[in-house]
Amino acid sequence: MSIRNDNASGGYMQPDQSSNASMHKRDLRVEEEIKPLDDMDSKGAVAADGEVHLRKSFSLWSILGVGFGLTNSWFGISTSMVAGISSGGPMMIVYGIIIVALISICIGTSLGELSSAYPHAGGQFWWSLKLAPPKYKRFAAYMCGSFAYAGSVFTSASTTLSVATEVVGMYALTHPEFIPKRWHIFVCFELLHLFLMFFNCYGKSLPIISSSSLYISLLSFFTITITVLACSHGKFNDAKFVFATFNNETGWKNGGIAFIVGLINPAWSFSCLDCATHMAFEVEKPERVIPIAIMGTVAIGFVTSFCYVIAMFFSIQDLDAVLSSTTGAPILDIYNQALGNKSGAIFLGCLILFTSFGCVIACHTWQARLCWSFARDNGLPLSRLWSQVNPHTGVPLNAHLMSCAWITLIGLLYLASSTAFQSLITGCIAFLLLSYIIPVICLLAKKRNIAHGPFWLGKFGFFSNIVLLGWTVFSVVFFSFPPVLPVTKDNMNYVCVVIVGYTAYSILYWKYKGKKEFHALEESENEQAEYSNNFDTIEDSREFSVAASDVELENEHVPWGKK
């Protein structure tokens, strides 16, 4: 890991070798007199030009709460198990988690390096702007932002749909005569979406909700895992069932294809690792905090999801009953078998439900920031409307509501196909990976020769970039395969149509409108300093810029993470 001093925009300050002790004291006094944005009376911070900015109200733990609250791997495994357990059984999910976690380390490393070099709420589309050749930088940034925003909307839709499936499944478990239909889940989806969208309408509560989501998720994980193991009374499956038994119920004659298609379950559970990068304007020292949050999300996700599935699969009493269940939520059937009572299974299901609320709220936080940041550069129709931060609530409210409107419409896909959930999951994974590879390709084209930030892993970073590119191609191709055979109009995976259609729309919008309106100009040094250093006026940032190099010089040899 390379450790160097970095400025707010990801480059390096050249220290003034002629600085003396009195200069240091004067500069430190200037720094101490700066008024943080958190102390301002307004809900959002008001710059010298009158524009309302986001407040720096997030800490490392609340950023990690947003990151893990969204990725939430053990929860993702639970709610999307229906998309994976029939493609290989427990064995596929266990080994799938290991495979995807290793790949996620590489994805997290790639994103962490870029977020450390260029901390910005735009995330990958901002990195594309900084790294792409001048001739193509605007188009690269636009396509990257367009893919990223689409991925965030599909993530929110798929997460909300998984929660709706869980709720309907809980009712079906206690009412054996009830047969869930698609319209039941659709109605539940829309009601849950309407309820949960209000939590992102007021910014002051978001850090509290984010931190709480982390603790609620971990508490639910421990409670469910311990309860299931304890109530199994030692009646566990043998290791061969968990680690070496392959069950293919997909109709694919090739077991390898079935396994690969089933990887969508753990892949979805480790997606959205860029979430924390879009909070860069709302946290101190984002060049350090964001990479920690990303890698922490992967680490916590692997430990919780792996331990969770091991406990669940050793406790299954009848796999065939789980696969043939009509609840639509296999994890509830596993709880019911382990506890031997539906009331206990419903209680554990409620813990998943509480965890899911934090996950969906984190989804909304993330997608709103992406939409807002992209709209600031005129990347969307009516960008002026979506790029505003509401001065009363302190959040990009218009961007949030517009994104929620799209989720409402995407929910209609579930009425068209019985495998729409699989399509939404694939859309989430594919669009996000496509947005990641654009800046990574630009980084590799520069031979990784950039003014990097404090998080930089050298050769392993290069290896991670290559893995990310290969995984993207693999995922977009294989996760677009039909989940079951024979294929009909009702079970077809329509995500390939969605990806091609949306890409065509983005290119056409760029050609006829975006090319003229999408400015994507780099922010001035003053504006970036205002965000990164938590100043309330541009004048303060100018004063601090004189002091910064000397103050940073004192810490030149302090290891990363200890400054």
Swiss-Prot record:
Biological processes annotated in GO: (R)-carnitine transport; choline transport; ethanolamine transport; gamma-aminobutyric acid transport; glycine betaine transport
InterPro entries: AA/rel_permease1, AA_permease, Amino_acid_permease_CS
Gene3D superfamilies: Amino acid/polyamine transporter I (1.20.1740.10)
Ranges facing Extracellular side: 1-57, 109-182, 227-255, 315-342, 418-426, 487-491
Residues in compartment: Cytoplasmic: 79-87, 204-205, 277-293, 364-398, 446-465, 513-563
Domain of life of the organism encoding this protein: Eukaryota
Function according to Swiss-Prot or TrEMBL: Sole choline transporter in yeast. Also transports ethanolamine.
Family, similarity comment: Belongs to the amino acid-polyamine-organocation (APC) superfamily. Amino acid/choline transporter (ACT) (TC 2.A.3.4) family.
Phosphoserine sites (modified residues): 22, 42
UniProt keyword terms in alphabetical order: Amino-acid transport, Glycoprotein, Membrane, Phosphoprotein, Transmembrane, Transmembrane helix, Transport
Note: Inhibition of activity by intracellular choline.
Glycosylation, residue list: 7, 20, 248, 341
TM helices/strands, residue ranges: 58-78, 88-108, 183-203, 206-226, 256-276, 294-314, 343-363, 399-417, 427-445, 466-486, 492-512
Intracellular or extracellular location(s): Membrane
Gene that specifies this protein: HNM1
Molecular function terms from GO: (R)-carnitine transmembrane transporter activity; choline transmembrane transporter activity; ethanolamine transmembrane transporter activity; gamma-aminobutyric acid transmembrane transporter activity
Catalysed reactions, as listed in the record: choline(out) = choline(in); ethanolamine(in) = ethanolamine(out)
Disordered, as annotated region: 1-25
Name of the molecule in the record: Choline transporter
Membrane topology: Multi-pass membrane protein
An annotated GO cellular component: plasma membrane
Organism: Saccharomyces cerevisiae (strain ATCC 204508 / S288c) (Baker's yeast)
Cross-referenced Pfam families: AA_permease_2 (PF13520)
